[in-house]
């Protein structure tokens, strides 16, 4: 009677490996979250540190720019440094313009990467395009690496676009320019993928993307792309923007496609605020998937928005504190307390919805609103277990959460 998201689109499964770590994109695998560094890749230590931060935040693949000989030479050192730190997240090399040369001249770089990103719009010009694209595919075959053929409308193959514009002009009923652009993106991606297959790369080694900046543009392109091929698909706006605008745009575009069963891996291309951690894009990607019920990454905190009954900021401060605490604990809890990522915590501001929401969560607290009895009942698995009062409600509630996690999700509990 009631429906959720559409069944997942069937696609080829692409395995991305490093050591004992396997991340599968597509097939029956969950939708993956990936990210990209913004360090100078030639700075091996700085890049390794940021990769570690992104991996600890939950990024399952991390892309790094490989744009110069110095960057290519640093990749093996980055991989070695990460392995020493116990960080086995696969690295994706992002190549533009000179990737065919860097993969040829720096074989250790080619081997240290787990996946290559190729942009068919700038792999070469004119007659050189086919040979330089072929060289990159041959490197992927030689080193047994999957590739993402990533088309961007900001760097689209201009020869292809010009030819399609000419063909469109000769139609009895020409398409709108926007439709020609969509078709050029799709033809560039699928045509390049089919050429890679002709060169010997398996379909289970290819991921496709067609990135644009507009929400409706992305949805239109991916709906058609998904209909016309069986390759695994990487979703993301090419530039989402800063702050709430970037988050809203990414959520709208990616959420619409995921709801239709389209998409196998996502990257949220947020412009970080000055001084803000790069890990924000990972958190947003995870929260999109978790909010849609597609995956679970960390306990969810439900909190009311507040109203005239909640003139105190206590519930807001407590919700933020608990949410931050849960996120900070997840790198450890993920391995020690399997299943904790599905836990729900409610922090409510008054008696209207507080007790009801708290009973529906694994753990909930209903703080007193304006004029209410200054007491905060705590509910665990639907039952009222305690009433907190005084100045230390936050500390006491955090301890209750911590004790519940250890008791409910600890290895001993899991075995019983």
From Swiss-Prot:
Superkingdom of the source species: Bacteria
Reaction it catalyzes: (2E)-4-hydroxy-3-methylbut-2-enyl diphosphate + oxidized [flavodoxin] + H2O + 2 H(+) = 2-C-methyl-D-erythritol 2,4-cyclic diphosphate + reduced [flavodoxin]
Record-listed E.C. numbers: 1.17.7.3
SUPFAM superfamilies: Nitrite and sulphite reductase 4Fe-4S domain-like
Root EC class: oxidoreductase
Cofactor note (record): Binds 1 [4Fe-4S] cluster.
Obligatory cofactor(s): [4Fe-4S] cluster
GO molecular function: 4 iron, 4 sulfur cluster binding; 4-hydroxy-3-methylbut-2-en-1-yl diphosphate synthase activity (ferredoxin); 4-hydroxy-3-methylbut-2-enyl-diphosphate synthase activity (flavodoxin); iron ion binding
Functional pathway: Isoprenoid biosynthesis; isopentenyl diphosphate biosynthesis via DXP pathway; isopentenyl diphosphate from 1-deoxy-D-xylulose 5-phosphate: step 5/6
Biological process per Gene Ontology, one example term: isopentenyl diphosphate biosynthetic process, methylerythritol 4-phosphate pathway
Residues that, per the record, bind [4Fe-4S] cluster: 304, 307, 350, 357
InterPro entries: Dihydropteroate_synth-like_sf, IspG_bac, IspG_bac-typ, NO2/SO3_Rdtase_4Fe4S_sf
Alphabetized UniProt keyword annotations: 4Fe-4S, Iron, Iron-sulfur, Isoprene biosynthesis, Metal-binding, Oxidoreductase
TM stretches of this protein: none
Sequence similarity: Belongs to the IspG family.
NCBIfam families named among the record's database cross-references: ispG_gcpE, PRK00366.1
Described purpose of this protein according to its UniProt entry: Converts 2C-methyl-D-erythritol 2,4-cyclodiphosphate (ME-2,4cPP) into 1-hydroxy-2-methyl-2-(E)-butenyl 4-diphosphate.
Protein name: 4-hydroxy-3-methylbut-2-en-1-yl diphosphate synthase (flavodoxin)
Annotated source species: Burkholderia pseudomallei (strain K96243)
